[in-house]
Swiss-Prot record:
Belongs to the annexin family. Annexin repeats lie at residues 17-88, 89-160, 172-244, 248-319. GO terms for cellular component: cytoplasm; nucleus; plasma membrane; vesicle membrane. This is Annexin A5. It comes from the Eukaryota. It comes from Cynops pyrrhogaster. Keywords: Annexin, Calcium, Calcium/phospholipid-binding, Repeat. A pair of annexin repeats may form one binding site for calcium and phospholipid. Gene3D superfamilies: Annexin. The keyword Repeat applies. One of its GO terms (biological process) is negative regulation of coagulation.
């Protein structure tokens, strides 16, 4: 959502890449009695998604077998889920996660909120096209069929991917938007949700950051405080996620990661999704933000919250240890 200038992932193209050697190494690691999980995880995580796709193609050519199917049959549990996620083409991953969230058992609103609030307009357009091509279904129609109320309306607005890409900020419009948001919430009885939906789904990132500052000046409240007092349910959660992503995409996703591991139990699906989807974009930056916000490293929290090959794979995906 926010500008990703200076963003850095933890996974890059491997130098001296040899897809034939990698395919043979993976086949050997899964052939016969036992599976060499350590070799598999180290090889796949040290290759970019594009390189993994080439390995899968070469694997099928050499052995007449599907690499993902072999991983599924040889691995198990959360470790399998993570490694299989790494094999999904990057452009397809978000579309698959949304499809599962909408069409699985019950609607996984947190997944829909996380993806739709944090992706750029260009990424959302790509997700829509991929979703249509892969599932022969319209993302907007599926969302409308599975959600309701203002939550549905804001999602539909975000799916249009019409956020202003222009970096220039019009100070007069900033003032107008801040006042419109104030008049739609804190300054009236009830809440004019349409104003929040319209402004938060169409204005540019730099513009909205200025709007949030001006809103604080006018109202004496942070916009997040007003959203919490004026709205509720999934609509509130989505509004907050959009605002947080606009302020700092890395800050928002660091919070998502922290919440996936804090307290009893771990939301492994969220942990996997964020690490996999951001590993080649800005996971290094998310790691830095995580430490700054929570006083502990992402590595340390993963170390204490997970175990076995699954933990080893997650830690490797996070990049070098920064404790």
């Amino acid at each position: 959502m926010a500008c990703l200038k200076g963003a850095k992932g933890t996974v890059q193209d491997a130098p001296d890449f040899n897809d034939k050697e990698d395919a043979e190494t993976l086949r050997h690691a899964m052939k016969g009695l036992g599976t060499d999980e350590d070799t598999i995880l180290k090889l796949l995580i040290s290759r970019s998604n594009k390189q993994r796709q080439q390995i899968a193609l070469t694997y099928k050519t050499l052995f007449g077998r599907d690499l993902t199917d072999d991983l599924k049959s040889e691995l198990s549990g959360k470790f399998e889920t993570l490694l299989v996620a790494l094999m999904v083409p990057a452009h397809l991953y978000d579309a698959c996660e949304l499809r599962n969230a909408i069409k699985g058992l019950g609607t996984l609103e947190n997944v829909i909120i996380e993806i739709m609030a944090s992706r750029t307009a260009a990424e959302v357009k790509n997700i829509k096209e991929t979703y249509k091509k892969e599932f022969d279904s319209d993302l907007e129609k599926d969302i409308v069929g599975d959600t309701s109320g203002n939550f549905e309306r804001l999602l539909v607005s975000l799916v249009q991917a019409n956020r202003d890409p222009v970096g220039k900020v019009d100070e007069g419009q900033v003032e107008n938007d801040a006042k419109a948001l104030f008049d739609a919430g804190e300054n009236k009885w009830g809440t004019d949700e349409e104003t929040f939906i319209s402004i938060l789904s169409t204005r540019g990132v730099g513009h909205l950051r200025k709007v949030f500052d001006q809103y604080m000046t006018i109202s004496g409240y942070q916009i997040e405080e007003s959203i919490q007092s004026e709205t509720g349910g999934h609509f509130e959660k989505l509004l907050l996620a959009v605002v947080k992503s606009i302020r700092s995409i890395q800050g928002y996703l660091a919070e998502v990661l922290y919440n996936s591991m804090k307290g009893a139990g771990t939301d492994d699906q969220t942990l996997i999704r964020v690490l996999v989807s951001r590993s080649e974009i800005d996971l290094f930056n998310i790691r830095q933000t995580f430490r700054k916000h929570y006083g502990k490293s992402l590595h340390a929290m993963i170390q204490s919250d997970t175990s076995g090959d699954y933990r080893n794979a997650l830690l490797l995906l996070c990049g070098e240890i920064d404790d």
